[in-house]
Swiss-Prot record:
GO molecular function, one term: pyridoxamine phosphate oxidase activity
Function: Catalyzes the oxidation of either pyridoxine 5'-phosphate (PNP) or pyridoxamine 5'-phosphate (PMP) into pyridoxal 5'-phosphate (PLP).
Superkingdom of origin: Bacteria
Catalytic activity field: pyridoxamine 5'-phosphate + O2 + H2O = pyridoxal 5'-phosphate + H2O2 + NH4(+); pyridoxine 5'-phosphate + O2 = pyridoxal 5'-phosphate + H2O2
Protein name stated in the entry: Pyridoxine/pyridoxamine 5'-phosphate oxidase
Binding site for FMN: 61-66, 76-77, 82-83, 105, 140-141, 185, 195
GO biological process: pyridoxine biosynthetic process
The enzyme's E.C. designation: 1.4.3.5
Pathway: Cofactor metabolism; pyridoxal 5'-phosphate salvage; pyridoxal 5'-phosphate from pyridoxamine 5'-phosphate: step 1/1; Cofactor metabolism; pyridoxal 5'-phosphate salvage; pyridoxal 5'-phosphate from pyridoxine 5'-phosphate: step 1/1
Oligomer and partners: Homodimer.
Gene that this sequence comes from: pdxH
């Protein structure tokens, strides 16, 4: 067994105080996302999306956040993917943003709701053409005999869609994750980290400080 117990560091970038918190967690998330981008973090919109299968087995993968507002968090995916199939069975999901360089994390619990075709198409048309073509090529989460099969299909579809717009695949869509709770974690000195949990109750958010 590899011993990693000596790998540690101190957290020195400051704390998070109750008096500084807005009542709406999306305002704090927007501020933290802006600061993560300004800090030029690698992939600040990358989030871990956790789902659960019918046997209770959890799965995780990294997905890019594409939009957020007071209603929730939006991402897009192949509707035949493992995550989409699991969401169809159990739409309770968890999102996690690990912004280690600025000593912050955000953890979100909520329910994923499918976006309308109009909303999906609006985003799909903003993607680079090669990305649109790639959406047609990959049967996400299915087994492949070799990478060459995938590449061959890509160039085949690229020739097919050489002229004009690439149509939206019927098996490609997106989700709005409506949060029921959002936790903000700020690293603190002596491992006394600051954690604040926003919990949705009716039409308001209740804020609690959690022990680190």
């Amino acid at each position: 067994m590899t011993d990693l117990s000596d790998i540690r560091r101190e957290y020195t970038k400051g704390g998070l105080r109750r008096a500084d918190l807005p009542q709406n967690p999306m305002q704090l998330f927007e501020l933290w996302m802006t600061q993560a981008r300004d800090a030029e973090l690698s992939d600040p919109t990358a989030m871990c999306v956790a789902t659960v299968d019918e046997h209770g087995q959890p799965y995780q993968r990294i997905v890019l956040l594409k939009r957020f507002d007071d209603t929730g968090f939006v991402f897009f995916t192949n509707l035949g993917s493992r995550k989409a199939q699991q969401i169809a069975t159990n739409n309770k999901v968890s999102l996690h943003f690990p912004w280690h360089p600025i000593e912050r994390q955000v953890s979100i619990l909520g329910e994923a709701q499918p976006l309308s075709t109009a909303e999906v198409l609006k985003y799909f048309m903003t993607r680079p053409k090669d990305s649109q073509i790639a959406a047609w090529v990959s049967q996400q989460s299915s087994k492949l005999s070799a990478r060459q099969v995938l590449e061959g299909k890509f160039f085949e579809m690229k020739a097919k869609f050489a002229k004009g717009d690439v149509p939206l695949p019927s098996f490609w869509g997106g989700y709005l994750v409506k949060p029921s709770s959002i936790e903000f974690w700020q690293g603190g000195e002596h491992r006394l980290h600051d954690r604040f949990l926003y919990t949705r109750q009716a039409d308001e958010w209740v804020i609690d400080r959690l022990a680190p």
